[in-house]
Amino acid sequence: LRTTQAWDWRHRPLSQLSGGERQRVLLARALAVQAQVLLMDEPLANLDPPHQTDWLHTMRALVEAGGTVVSVLHEVSLALQADDMVVMAAGRVLHQGACDAPDTHAALEQVFDHRIHVRHLDGMWMALPSIHRHNKTREIDA
């Protein structure tokens, strides 16, 4: 609870917590089991940017300590902070590779059917959608 800054709510029922507070308690629960592998679906949902950053640092520390973190993230800028990315659509893997690889960025554009500008800024990868739609037709089979 201290790692996710949720200690002050330890006596409150989960139903009385906000979405972000509840998410931080659930993340603390995931850490408490001390598993070598964490599988998470949208762990950063409902968290404000400072707590998203804190959790990204926590996940990085787990990996550096020899653990494995697998996470589903739909926010591309957050997903780009990982070492590797698997881009999926319609239940199929379209691409797997390093987050900083141009072919990964191309796969993201394909799956979102939208031009995405990926830039490295202040030590982080950022993804910004273009205001113009991708000119190609979507090539993903349902």
Regions picked out by a protein language model, each given a short descriptive name:
Residues 13-17, 21:
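Conserved ABC ATPase signature
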Residues 27-28:
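Hydrophobic anchor residue at the start of the ABC signature
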Residues 38-42:
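Catalytic Walker B motif of ABC-type/P-loop ATPase nucleotide-binding domains
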Residues 72-74:
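H-loop/switch region of ABC-family ATPase nucleotide-binding domains
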